[in-house]
Amino acid sequence: MTSVVLLEQLKAFTEKIMDDMILPVAMQQGDTEQAYRAPEVYLMRLPDSRSAKKKAPYIIHRVIPLETEQQPGSEERTVVSVRSIFCCYNPDEQEGDLALLNMMERFRVELLKVRKVGGTGTDGKHRYQFALDLSPGHKLESVPYDGETKPYYAGEMITYWKLPTVQQTEDIKLWR
């Protein structure tokens, strides 16, 4: 459940920082003029994977491996990886690559500015629940996909997030 809340908070953050980035939408059969809009944000996958080209521009945030560990003498920590997939459309190849780079860079820069996402508490104050983890081995990576996909351009970014610690509520009794 906690990773679902992270995805929801990441979606809200992404929608806020991308709301003024207006990109071309692929023209569909029957369209008479080019439409433009901000990238839509989805969680885990597109609602209909067969419509990947029709949905561009978009960003998908997807949780990948979750790990919980506890080193001797230190607090338990849970880290989740999030793969963010970016996709845009542009009939001009140079503009398409630049639009993709712009989407990915805006997300990366805004994320590095705050390094946390969260929600609003019952008192109306902003609460940060999730911290970006840039510890050794958890670097922020971004890769534009190479390949002949024009006029669609895609790339991905991997981020790591520290989740709140789950508190043990029951004592463990071992059989003897």
Q: Each PLM stretch: what is its role?
A:
Residues T68-P72, Y89-E95, L163-I172:
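Short, cysteine-centered beta-strand-loop-beta hairpins and adjacent loop/turn segments enriched
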Residues M1-P72, L174-R176:
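Small/polar-rich, solvent-exposed N-terminal microdomains that initiate assembly or binding
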Residues K53, S74-T78, A99, G147-Y153:
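A generic structural micro-feature
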